[in-house]
Amino acid sequence: MKTRLFLLLALSLVLFSCEDKNDEPWSPQTQDVKIVALSGSTIYSMNTADGQLKTTSIGDSYGTLENLFLHNGEMMLFSKASDGYRMMKFDGDNITSNNIVTLLNDYLGDSWWANVTSSGNNYFYACSNREKYVILDENGNSREYNYALDNSHPYYSLATVNGNGNFYQAYIYFQSSTPKDDYWVVKKNGQEIYQVSGIKVEPIHTNINAIGDNVYLLGSNYDDKGVYAMNSNAVVDDHFTVISCACVINGQLCLGGYKTDEHKVNRATMKVGDKYYDLTDELGWYEYKDAETGAGNNHSSCVESFMVENNEIYVRVRKYSQVNPYISGGYDYFNASGDAIFRNTHKVMDLGDKLIRSCVIIPQK
């Protein structure tokens, strides 16, 4: 009898451990990768095999570094200098080519914003001068879109380009004194694809992410609950206060943002499939101000963006400090205090007080 009970117990433990092992939505961390992040004029890189952080200073001679991305297996840097935009190859230690990009200046003159997106095999410039958006491919082919739908109305706008060169815009018009009557218009390549209401403007974290052929509008509703939409129906998820980013891994939708706790501190949170993960303890950045004495500080965090590589998810988590908190236009003021990168749910790179402009994941053989 004791032997039978022992065997049943052992079998149940094996089944439990197998179920737990296969329950995660991502692949096991078996492959070494190099994480390369751009912050200011410095490149930070780390190989997960040894965990050693390496820094490479580019200096200011190339202007403001705007973006870091992979193109045909090579790292590329995009910058804005006094003489125009530059596209540069970067081998991990040095800039190996430095070509001025005249296309953007030819179209816009002194544009206020420009960036690059890549599918890995081709890339697209997206830029604006607050009158129009211009999308160019690497061969100089161009498309133009209006910056606003209707300049006679106050509005707030978002824009993004995916790796296939599709351009997405989202506008919310402030129609009346009743915010809940406001609605978003979402366009793809200049054509309206849906309208959606119930998502308010949260200037820091309201966002759009293009994933495949879908575009997700992300943010918070008027009851301070996380919300996302990929069509005219907004989906509320009260495990979040704000949803700020999305991706798909192994066919499952992944959402990131934060949940405000009882101390009014925002906790970095992500959802994969039907599971939720609080990354705050692993991040090691949490503190709340004592409500009675005022002692201490509010240290918050938020999942800001995702990258997917080899069925693993890489998460950029931002640390925030609440500095002289006040309410301006209905929003708390928080100061960005630094970024960290998680591999699935574990922190692998922490840049202290440095903010990551862009980041790439490079598998190592």
Task: List each model region and its residues.
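Bacterial Sec-dependent N-terminal signal peptides
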Residues: 2-33, 40
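Residue-level hotspots at or immediately adjacent to binding/recognition sites across diverse folds
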Residues: 24-365
